[in-house]
Each structure stands twice: as structure tokens, then as C-alpha cells.
A protein has these predicted regions:
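Short, small-residue-biased leader/transition segments that mark boundaries at the very start
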Residues: 2-6
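Rossmann-fold NAD(P) dinucleotide-binding segment
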Residues: 7-71
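Rossmann-fold dinucleotide-binding core
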Residues: 50-135
Length: 166
């Protein structure tokens, strides 16, 4: 009962609703679940999900939200806690251009870069590529560090430069 009350107050009059939770199941529950915001969604409202989730889920949510009279964009974040605290996040957005133009001014308040990649799901796909690039870069650095000075070189110095930044 309490969850429904919170959901209704949080979403029934909102033009834009932002979510950022743990994973696909959490997003699905918050938006589509029995107490999900979709049940009190205002006509023509926009749901922006900042969770790093799957592109398949983004496409699923888009269908349900459109059917309920709203719009959806997937907009995963990059930059971590430090980026969030300093308003320097990078946001990769998937959705319609007209919907993006409505939510971008809000996201510009906490992002240094907010880019429309393509249709719904594209933001998640771009984030996946970003994560693969970061992991590949770190693996490459660690591999090369082990070869310096017959493996006696410490990789600690790399923690203090851009190699370890998100």
C-alpha cells in the first residue's frame, strides 16, 4: 500500500520520470511491476532510465510505455560517483530525437556530455562498447606492466593517471 502511494505521488503528475537502479530485474520491477510507475503514468510523460541494463530490456520498456501513452529513452551513465558529484557524467542516450530534445536540458544539469546515439536501445549498446573498451585498455596496460623490468615494475603509478579513469 505504501509503495503504491509513493509511486502515485512520484509519477502521476510528472512530465519526466528518471530511474537509476541496479539491473534489468530492478528496472522492470520499478517501471512495469505491480507497483511500477507505468500504472500511474501521465499521458505523454517521458521515462528516462539511467541504469546500465540490456538493450533488449530498453526495447521491451519502450513498447509498454508507448502503449501506456508515454515515451522512453535509455540513458546509461558513465563517470562514476565522482562524475555524479561534480556534474561531469557522460550520458549515452537511445530514443527518439524529439523526446531527447525534451529531456536533454534536465540531463545537462548533471552531465558534461549527453549524446543521442540512435533509437531506443542504442544508449545501452554504446555503454556496452564503452565498458569493453575500458576493460580491454586495462588488460593491455597490466599485460605490458608485467613485462617492464622483468616483472618487477609496479602498476601502482597507473592508478594516478587517466588509465584508471572511467
Amino acid at each position: 500500500q505504501r509503495q503504491m502511494c509513493i509511486r502515485d505521488r512520484a509519477s502521476k503528475d510528472a512530465d519526466i520520470i528518471f530511474t537509476c537502479v541496479g539491473n534489468d530485474d530492478d528496472v522492470r520491477e520499478v517501471i512495469l511491476g505491480s507497483n511500477g510507475v507505468i500504472h500511474s503514468l501521465k499521458n505523454k510523460a517521458i521515462i528516462v532510465d539511467h541504469t546500465t541494463a540490456s538493450s533488449v530490456l530498453a526495447e521491451e520498456l519502450d513498447k509498454h510505455i508507448n502503449k501506456a501513452g508515454g515515451s522512453f529513452v535509455d540513458a546509461p551513465l558513465s563517470g562514476g560517483q565522482a562524475g555524479a558529484e561534480s556534474g561531469q557524467l557522460t550520458i549515452m542516450v537511445g530514443g527518439e530525437k524529439v523526446v531527447f530534445s525534451k529531456v536533454r536540458p534536465v540531463m545537462n544539469n548533471y552531465a558534461k556530455a549527453c549524446t543521442l546515439i540512435g533509437g531506443v536501445g542504442s544508449g545501452q549498446k554504446a555503454k556496452m562498447v564503452n565498458q569493453i573498451c575500458i576493460a580491454s585498455h586495462l588488460i593491455n596496460c597490466i599485460s605490458h606492466c608485467s613485462k617492464i623490468n622483468n616483472g618487477r615494475y609496479s602498476c601502482e603509478i597507473l592508478k594516478n593517471n587517466s588509465t584508471w579513469s572511467e
